[in-house]
């Protein structure tokens, strides 16, 4: 069986934990992860001044698709940059149309709203993004730490990054694989 593929879109101002933890967990599960820089291949300064080097540019990554999941990290500035990108919109719309999984965490779900993706789904987000997500009644809102409704998977923030990442693994590779990856992480149940 061919390994699953994930695209993580990295924008300036992304939240570090919400980027790195899903990348790490998915790679532990054998998922081929591409970290794509929204503004190109140059290192990206994240919300807490951690610098992450993308594998490639988003433009280049798009030519290597499709992906089994597209992941949108949060961070206020990062989510704003994702929300303002025509290329992100194109990728999300293609993913939605081909019935591929889309996962967004913290403020990342606001990019779904901006690009009119997943309307009608139940979502969650960082508590400070709730009002924005509920503007226009395009979604129903959940206070769950992780919410999966069909092919839209959302989560709340840095503290839910492991749960979010394991939910992506479970959606792509099954519960057994998620449990196998989780065991050595010494997470609190």
Curated annotation (Swiss-Prot):
GO terms for cellular component: axon; cell body; chromatin; cytoplasm; cytosol; endoplasmic reticulum; extracellular exosome; membrane raft. Deglycase activity does not require glutathione as a cofactor, however, glycated glutathione constitutes a PARK7 substrate. Transmembrane segments: none annotated. The record marks 149-150 as: Cleavage. The modification N6-acetyllysine is found at residue 148. It is a lipid-anchor. Homodimer. Binds EFCAB6/DJBP and PIAS2. Part of a ternary complex containing PARK7, EFCAB6/DJBP and AR. Interacts (via N-terminus) with OTUD7B. Interacts with BBS1, HIPK1, CLCF1 and MTERF. Forms a complex with PINK1 and PRKN. Interacts (via C-terminus) with NCF1; the interaction is enhanced by LPS and modulates NCF1 phosphorylation and membrane translocation. Interacts with NENF. This is Parkinson disease protein 7 homolog. It comes from Rattus norvegicus (Rat).
């Amino acid at each position: 069986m061919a390994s699953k593929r994930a695209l993580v879109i990295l924008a300036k101002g992304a939240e570090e934990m919400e980027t790195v933890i899903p990348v790490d967990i998915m790679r532990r599960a054998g998922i081929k992860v591409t970290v794509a820089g929204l503004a190109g291949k140059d290192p990206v300064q994240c919300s807490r001044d951690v610098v992450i080097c993308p594998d490639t540019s988003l433009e280049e990554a798009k030519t290597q698709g499709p992906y089994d999941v597209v992941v949108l990290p949060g961070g206020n500035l990062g989510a704003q940059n994702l929300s303002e990108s025509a290329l992100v919109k194109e990728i999300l719309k293609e993913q939605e149309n081909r019935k591929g999984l889309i996962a967004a965490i913290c403020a990342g779900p606001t990019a779904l709203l901006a690009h009119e993706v997943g309307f009608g789904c139940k979502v969650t987000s960082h508590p400070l993004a709730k009002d924005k997500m509920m503007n226009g009644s395009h979604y129903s809102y959940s206070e769950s730490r992780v919410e999966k409704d069909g092919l839209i998977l959302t989560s709340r923030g840095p503290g839910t990054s492991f749960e979010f990442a394991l939910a992506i693994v479970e959606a792509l590779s099954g519960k057994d694989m998620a449990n196998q990856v989780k065991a050595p992480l010494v997470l609190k149940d």
